[in-house]
Amino acid sequence: MIKTLTNLRKQEKEKFVVPKGVQDVIPITAIYDDGIFQIGKDKFSKTYKFSDINYAVASREDKEAMFLEYSELLNSLDSGATTKITINNRRLNRLDFENNILIPMKGDSLDEYRKEYNKILLEKATGANAIVQDKYMTISVNKKNIEDARNYFARVGADLIAHFGRLGSQCVELETDERLRIFHDFYRVGEESSFHFDIKETRKKGHSFKDYICPDSMEFEKDYFKMGDRYGRVLFLREYASYIKDSMVAELTDLNRNLMMSIDVVPVPTDEAVREAENRLLGVETNITNWQRRQNSNNNFSATVPYDMEQQKKEMKEFLDDLTTRDQRMMFAVITFVHTADSKEQLDNDTEALLTTARKHLCQFGVLKFQQVDGLNTVMPFGVRKIDTFRTLTTESLAVFIPFRVQDIFHENGIYYGQNVISKNMIIADRKQLLNGNSFILGVSGGGKSFAAKGEIENVILSSDSDVIIIDPEREYSQLVRALGGEVIHISATSQNHINAMDMTKEYGDGANPVILKSEFIMSLCEQLIGGSNLGAKQKSIIDRCTASVYRTYQQNNYQGEVPTLQDFRAELLKQDEPEAQEIALAIELFTSGSLNTFAKHTNVDTNNRLICYDILDLGKQLMPIGMLVVLDSILNRITQNRAKGRNTFIFIDEIYLLFQHEYSANFLFTLWKRVRKYGAYATGITQNVDDLLQSHTARTMLANSEFIIMLNQASTDRLELAKLLNISDLQMSYITNVEAGHGLIKVGSSLVPFANKFPKNTKLYKLM
């Protein structure tokens, strides 16, 4: 017998003790502050949680790369320890779920919309899987004392985190209370929100940690067990197919039930594995030689070696080649599975569904008879293994049981964006949790861009105290804005609404003198007003001097009272002696006292409303460049004000490509895009002209640096450009090719998942959208 296996069984050999209570079923003997559990005389375990990656929707090449990287991870496992890979399906606790996603009432006129939105969210939650899939890796090792165990786990943990990082998966060590929560949530389904554990408090009171996690009662029958009012059954993989698809684990864990699947891995040192393989090959060759000798003694000199002997020899040679030339390791594996249900009938039906799924892959699950308690302790991430149904595998054949499927996005206190097409779970994202919360919504006309933007605007206004500012060149948002109590500001040469281009708050300068920053803005404005030509050094000096002069009184009054206007600025220019000043004054006359003087008057609209929509549909060609600059500067004013109040600002710019047609507004927008994050603001660009957008290097950089992108149905040329820029696989591309409105891909940080967002039509909110 292989030495590794002999030593392992010797280490794990324990005297059987009949459990006197439910606590005795739990095989943990001691717990430590750093998440290490003692699970035997000299055995310690530690659990690491790793995140899912987009394996199911990756291209063939990417899948191969992930598979090889996962094989590398398995190869790196220490042969002196046992590794348990666990997939845990747990149902979301309805109370926690509702607290996370439902919008609280505020006692204002918008409560009717909040109630309606909450009703929609609850319907979506009921129709969704409502299952969260957690993935763990538990390492258990024999050490003389806890200090040795700590040193070992510190070394192994760093390697694990690095390997998972190369896969694109985030791996973290679990603390003591996090590990105990796994067992509590399994044993006490429905009581998830009641878990509270403080190790110091527990020690002080002399309580056992097991009291916090164990169920009220446990009964073990021949082929199932009862845990409180729930039923459970442990299965094991009895027979493996010669060829197994990499989707098997995903299909087995796709059942919409509380369940766990564990793969126990015992790596064998390569020298020992090679020696064992050589001995086995020698044994097969000896059998063949003996068979031929017997045939020769019977004068049967032309007899061919039997097929089964030839096969054995061929397979052993391949196995030896794998170990010696293909960088494979020999592994022992045990696959166990536990699932629970509310009734025995449901349990039997679920068992049959699992057995059918395994048979589809030509594998066979077996029910553990009279071993349910051992099976349960094996499948759960304690770090123990009581089931000995080992199967010898190579790294490659073990890697087929790859635990990855698709990323789910569920941020606490996030916004609903749709449902994951693959896992059927709700996509709840919070842009505030991203490194860069700026966003783009891209898609062909009729793909659902405005609908997606309006959905987010509704959610922000109803669920938070954040401000929302919209730039609307198509007059699409007016109805929604008015219904939500917002202010629509019509900007044109003939409009009665005016925004003062020289509006400035104390916070405008980001801690420095705000006039310095405003002076730069007025220089850009003058360049536009003069006709897009660059200003000379003299002209810039004059503008800077006049800007400081017109703001002096306003600054001395601590930014209170009447703000100067462009008319005051022109009057100041006319006071200057230099001929250049007179030239600038003449050039901007049309925009200060002429027919296009809409931005040279005092602001007469409510720019302090929580929800503001700048309607720029009637802004003519002459006013468009300066109009966009003034609107963007007004937005910057508002953002800096909100920053001082600790309030977030969401900016939505529809048909954003229009801003990139003018150099100054494009550069101003680029600066805004870089700066808003530190101001607690989040900008969203909406466009159907992706190809045009990507012609601008500025826009391309902005898109590449945005961590939140909603891609709906795309035109063929746009798809290719996006695929190159965002590294989208062909399979992922199919989710933005000829799909219905509201379907596509959503990029949240490094996650890229296919989604569908269907909104009920018989609602007030839908009519507003």
Predicted features, each with a name:
Residues M1-F404:
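Extended, folded cores of ATP/NTP-driven motor/assembly subunits in large transport
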Residues I53, R60-S79, R90, T253, ...:
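P-loop NTPase motor domains
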Residues I441:
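Hydrophobic anchor at the beta1->P-loop junction of P-loop NTPases
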Residues K449:
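Conserved lysine of the Walker
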Residues A452:
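Hydrophobic positions on the alpha1 helix immediately C-terminal to the Walker A/P-loop
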Residues N459-I469:
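Post-Walker A helix-loop "phosphate-sensing" segment adjacent to the P-loop in P-loop NTPases
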Residues G485-I489, T698-M711:
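A short helix-turn-beta junction within AAA+ P-loop NTPase domains corresponding to the substrate/partner-engaging
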Residues L726-M769:
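Conserved P-loop NTPase
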